[in-house]
């Protein structure tokens, strides 16, 4: 057991890929370090962590009801400052609010490691913002990114060195959870079944998928079912589009599921339509269950995971016509699609669970 004290900064915990990696990494580290603490406002996720992890959150229940992201970061920064004042020899691993966390840590002369989760192109618009990000990021003791493409972005935009570690993929856990029984009659054997899993926000761009399936309904006689699993601000907009275009019988939107894998197991193909990512876990999960992946060529991650089209179908970002063509290709070319799936599945060895977790251990113990 290593004597260092590790503090993980993550103001808001949701159900996305970042959080899945958080649970895996934190629980692994708790078996190797004397003390692991997590600062977050999301008390409801406390049970997802090992019991020996110290969960630090605001005592007032008021913070559970607040949805404002900046306020949640602010209260967690206050809790972080308190920890840094009263405890010595702390090493901080930041999953969210990286710039703010870095500033606080450097003020108190604490070591901080930033884990960057989303492509620079998605949030670095604006000259001043880039300068500010570059200046603060240089203060960090280390920056971790989760794809080679992501690492190249940091070098190109900021000339910053980063440590590249792929997401640790627990294939056994995914397969185990996919076998849990669900009462789900939406998919039919005689239809082509598709799924999208992700937050219903602009970044994930689910409206593009709906537009492509509208084309499929108008231009072909193929029978299809599309399930979208997720929660977010764009839900009403998506439902309105479905109703307006009479797609209710073919497309279903359902709320976020703690365990989406039984639904993923029942589908034929997974679609990712994002305009930016980091390294989308959900593609790894789809390949683990041997499903064809149809993904946008957004920065960063999808092209790298899918071996630039050898392990899945890639369409031009924000182009519903190209996505439509890829859907048609999948429907018409079963044997070629199966070959893509085999290649994609075999390439999952890059995301080795133990190997990638050990990389985090080395960094935090250095």
Question: Which positions does each model-derived feature cover?
Answer:
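Short hydrophobic beta-strand element within catalytic cores of glycosyltransferases
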Residues: 292-296
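Short acidic/histidine- and often glycine-rich active-site loop of Leloir-type glycosyltransferases
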Residues: 285, 298-309, 313-314
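A conserved mid-protein helix/loop that constitutes part of the nucleotide-sugar donor-binding site
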Residues: 16-24, 192, 196-217, 233-239, ...
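Short His-centered aromatic/hydrophobic patch
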Residues: 93-100, 116-117
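Carbohydrate-associated surface elements
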Residues: 149, 168
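Aromatic "clamp/platform" in nucleotide-sugar-dependent glycosyltransferases that forms part
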Residues: 256, 275
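Conserved acidic donor-binding segment of nucleotide-sugar-dependent glycosyltransferases
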Residues: 307-320, 329-335, 349
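N-terminal strand-loop element at the rim of the active site
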Residues: 8-68, 150-155, 234
């Amino acid at each position: 057991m290593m004597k260092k004290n590790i503090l993980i900064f993550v103001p808001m915990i949701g159900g996305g890929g970042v959080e899945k990696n958080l649970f895996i990494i934190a629980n692994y580290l708790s078996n190797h370090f004397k003390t692991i603490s997590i600062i977050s406002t999301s008390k409801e996720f406390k049970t997802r962590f090992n019991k020996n992890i110290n969960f630090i959150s605001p005592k007032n229940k008021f913070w559970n009801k607040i949805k404002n992201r900046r306020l949640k970061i602010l209260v967690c920064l206050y809790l972080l400052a308190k920890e840094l004042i009263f405890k010595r020899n702390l090493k901080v691993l930041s999953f969210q609010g990286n710039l703010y966390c870095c500033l606080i840590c450097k003020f108190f002369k604490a070591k901080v490691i930033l884990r960057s989760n989303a492509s620079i192109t998605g949030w670095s618009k604006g000259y001043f913002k880039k300068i500010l990000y570059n200046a603060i990021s240089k203060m960090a003791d280390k920056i971790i990114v989760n794809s080679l493409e992501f690492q190249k972005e940091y070098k190109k935009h900021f000339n910053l060195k980063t440590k590249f570690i792929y997401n640790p993929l627990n294939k056994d856990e995914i397969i185990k959870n996919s076998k849990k029984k669900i009462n789900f009659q939406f998919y039919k054997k005689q239809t082509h079944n598709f799924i999208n899993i992700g937050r219903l926000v602009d970044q994930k761009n689910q409206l593009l998928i709906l537009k492509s399936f509208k084309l499929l309904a108008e231009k072909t006689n193929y029978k299809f079912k599309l399930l979208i699993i997720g929660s977010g601000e764009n839900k009403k907009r998506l439902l309105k589009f479905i109703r307006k275009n009479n797609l209710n019988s073919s497309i279903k939107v359902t709320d976020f599921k703690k365990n989406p894998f039984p639904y993923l197991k029942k589908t034929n193909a997974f679609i990712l339509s994002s305009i930016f990512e980091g390294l989308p876990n959900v593609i790894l999960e789809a390949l683990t269950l041997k499903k064809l992946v149809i993904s946008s060529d957004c920065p960063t991650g999808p092209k790298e995971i899918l071996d630039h089209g050898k392990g899945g179908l890639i369409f031009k970002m924000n182009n519903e016509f190209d996505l439509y063509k890829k859907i048609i290709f999948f429907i018409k070319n079963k044997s070629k699609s199966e070959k893509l799936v085999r290649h994609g599945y075999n390439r999952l060895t890059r995301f080795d669970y133990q190997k990638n977790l050990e990389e985090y251990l080395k960094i935090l113990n250095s």
